[in-house]
Amino acid sequence: MSQSTFVLRRNGFTFKQFFVAHDRCAMKVGTDGILLGAWAPVAGVKRCLDIGAGSGLLALMLAQRTDDSVMIDAVELESEAAAQAQENINQSPWAERINVHTADIQQWITQQTVRFDLIISNPPYYQQGVECSTPQREQARYTTTLDHPSLLTCAAECITEEGFFCVVLPEQIGNGFTELALSMGWHLRLRTDVAENEARLPHRVLLAFSPQAGECFSDRLVIRGPDQNYSEAYTALTQAFYLFM
């Protein structure tokens, strides 16, 4: 499908090589997901897992960034979101490489015999309390259906020894998530703190954990420069995806 066809569509987000419809998904395409999909380390991976796939954004971004031999499994609990993810993937250049599963990850993982070099998730992080407009959005935003200990346990059960488990979270929640992960035997290997501009404190954090101990590399990413245009670093990270960058 051509870029001109993508541009005419209004029910989702247009990227350079694919289109993500998200009108039937509780959580829409946003900066968090784009950051995570562009940032996660893909060198040498053979098999990837997207937990809580939503519209299929992360699976599609990983497919664009990896070799044609890399297979990707995308697991999504909510049936309507999973159906839309499948439609998005069917219309992409990588339909043969991405498998969508409508399933509870905690049940699905027990049936798997393969392990994954890269596991990626843009997980829910709100606790119950703030009212949501729909049950689907509540499921996407709250940790009630998949809390963080369960998410870390699922990832641990199917990751390779040298693999990476990558998430994006609000800064403070990410700090707590890191403490929890370390207490469960994970090792933090990559951390990028994300700020809107140089004057602001980081509001998001990108984290990569591994079962294997090693040096932790950390840095800071600023999204916008003094002129309010995208910074050089953010442009370098995401320009393979944004249509007009």
Swiss-Prot record:
GO molecular function annotations of the record:
nucleic acid binding; tRNA (adenine-N6)-methyltransferase activity
Q: Kindly report, in one word, the top-level EC class recorded for this enzyme.
A: transferase
Q: Which InterPro entries match?
A: DNA_methylase_N6_adenine_CS, SAM-dependent_MTases_sf, Small_mtfrase_dom, tRNA_Adenine-N(6)_MTase, tRNA_adenine-N6_MeTrfase
Q: Where in the cell is the protein located? A: Cytoplasm
Give the highest taxon in the source lineage: Bacteria
Please give the PROSITE patterns that the UniProt record associates with this protein: N6_MTASE
One Pfam family name is MTS
What is one cellular component GO term in this UniProt entry?
Answer: cytoplasm
**UniProt keyword Cytoplasm present:** yes
The reaction(s) catalysed by this protein are: adenosine(37) in tRNA1(Val) + S-adenosyl-L-methionine = N(6)-methyladenosine(37) in tRNA1(Val) + S-adenosyl-L-homocysteine + H(+)
Gene3D superfamilies recorded: Vaccinia Virus protein VP39
Documented EC number(s): 2.1.1.223
The record ties this protein, via PANTHER family, to: TRNA1(VAL) (ADENINE(37)-N6)-METHYLTRANSFERASE
Similarity section: Belongs to the methyltransferase superfamily. tRNA (adenine-N(6)-)-methyltransferase family.
Quote the protein name from its UniProt record.
tRNA1(Val) (adenine(37)-N6)-methyltransferase
- What is the species listed in this Swiss-Prot or TrEMBL entry? Escherichia coli O7:K1 (strain IAI39 / ExPEC)
